[in-house]
Amino acid sequence: MFSEQAAQRAHTLLSPPSANNATFARVPVATYTNSSQPFRLGERSFSRQYAHIYATRLIQMRPFLENRAQQHWGSGVGVKKLCELQPEEKCCVVGTLFKAMPLQPSILREVSEEIIPPVSAFQHNLLPQPPRSKYIHPDDELVLEDELQRIKLKGTIDVSKLVTGTVLAVFGSVRDDGKFLVEDYCFADLAPQKPAPPLDTDRFVLLVSGLGLGGGGGESLLGTQLLVDVVTGQLGDEGEQCSAAHVSRVILAGNLLSHSTQSRDSINKAKYLTKKTQAASVEAVKMLDEILLQLSASVPVDVMPGEFDPTNYTLPQQPLHPCMFPLATAYSTLQLVTNPYQATIDGVRFLGTSGQNVSDIFRYSSMEDHLEILEWTLRVRHISPTAPDTLGCYPFYKTDPFIFPECPHVYFCGNTPSFGSKIIRGPEDQTVLLVTVPDFSATQTACLVNLRSLACQPISFSGFGAEDDDLGGLGLGP
Amino acid sequence: MGRKRLITDSYPVVKRREGPAGHSKGELAPELGEEPQPRDEEEAELELLRQFDLAWQYGPCTGITRLQRWCRAKQMGLEPPPEVWQVLKTHPGDPRFQCSLWHLYPL
């Protein structure tokens, strides 16, 4: 749609300079509200245990699950607590899942000094486990916990797919061996959604993630500069410039700095060797500041921090500090926002993360496709169910802010290996566009979301590298 | 031989004189009549707060103050007992009332 619009205009490149220059005014953002307030942390206190998050998660999700259970299994189904279970009686139980994974990295196992020969094949007492891409194992077990008790689950439940921290309702009965035999289970499914007001013109939002500055690769820098030039309307014909003027916002979804800026070799070296060296992230942040300056001079930009960015590690990640961007903060169009980011742009609700939640679920579940995992988090009604267990999280005590209070129209996650987009429907006619924004430093691809039609289109920028042999195809070779 | 030498032998021996009824604390009672009643009331209030801490319906009690836990329960619609709020409001700043049962233990 972007390039079709562009192709319709008359070609003006390769023609003598004209007396009058065409100007294109960027579409103004009619309404924008940033609703990431639940993810902002004020005074932080870490002298609390994580039991509070789990307790509030269960208390908040219980009514949703009881409703869904009654919709699935009839309104007469009895929802019981684990302490009220009678053997062989079919009922429904609502609780939080815990997956006991022997391969899960455990600091206690790493530092334990037992030299007793391992009982099971995968207990490495002497060496720390090497990082793997997936930590699932056929021997994983699922345990359902409610406020007071826990019970092991068996039966028709997909152990490898589910992860710790999911709140669900199971239907079945408890057996003589003390385990709960599951016949069916259900999640909280999509939250209620307010319909988006219809728009009259095409407006686009550009989603980019994984710029990966400071990584040392010149390839991605060219791609980044091309991206900035397209958005600011300095590239292409009048058609492309006109289309670029329809981009009303740019969201940078995390990993603006590359993983290599986080190298901590200087810690192991002697002080006299590292005295004058700067951290790699300093140079990278300067480059980022210049790019943001070019972008924010022309279009509103929202910058979300990611896994390798200089902000806190635990979710929700707080916005990058404006002192790092002395040039770009002069423009009010630059907005530094939190990691799970929620906003309403022209009536369309956006919600997205920089990808840590999806990649953590990828490590501990058998689901392979990031888009499938993204859809699954929406169906479970929780942005990041693994949050305190395997993904760092702030110890909330009042509410769990990662539960979806209402369903967004566009739900994205950044730093995925490839681009994907899908429209899903909910049980109450909710429509959500799911977008997995690929890592720009690897794929040179960004996503354009059309707010009017809720469709998503990839846009890729690539230059001809030295190793490209496409030049032969162009007829330039000997 | 006498008994073994204990370290307490280096301290002077002081024996408290027992009152005629066998209790030495009872002397104060007739002089200040109001003391035992507030103490009983306080004890009853502290007991109420301790029961509130141990009630499982309102979630974990460690790491947060009783007022925070009461407000959280109220916001979630769990209907915590209003008497607890009254007691907490009448004794602001007193750690025996405001902090949970386990606040002296780290985490």
UniProtKB/Swiss-Prot annotation, chain B:
GO terms for cellular component: delta DNA polymerase complex; nucleoplasm. One of its GO terms (biological process) is positive regulation of endothelial cell proliferation. InterPro entries: DNA_pol_delta_4 (IPR007218). Residues 15-28 have a biased composition (Basic and acidic residues). It is found in: Nucleus. Component of the tetrameric DNA polymerase delta complex (Pol-delta4), which consists of POLD1/p125, POLD2/p50, POLD3/p66/p68 and POLD4/p12, with POLD1 bearing DNA polymerase and 3' to 5' proofreading exonuclease activities. Within this complex, directly interacts with POLD1 and POLD2. Directly interacts with PCNA, as do POLD1 and POLD3; this interaction stimulates Pol-delta4 polymerase activity. As POLD1 and POLD2, directly interacts with WRNIP1; this interaction stimulates DNA polymerase delta-mediated DNA synthesis, independently of the presence of PCNA. This is DNA polymerase delta subunit 4. It comes from Homo sapiens. The lineage of its organism: Eukaryota, Metazoa, Chordata, Craniata, Vertebrata.
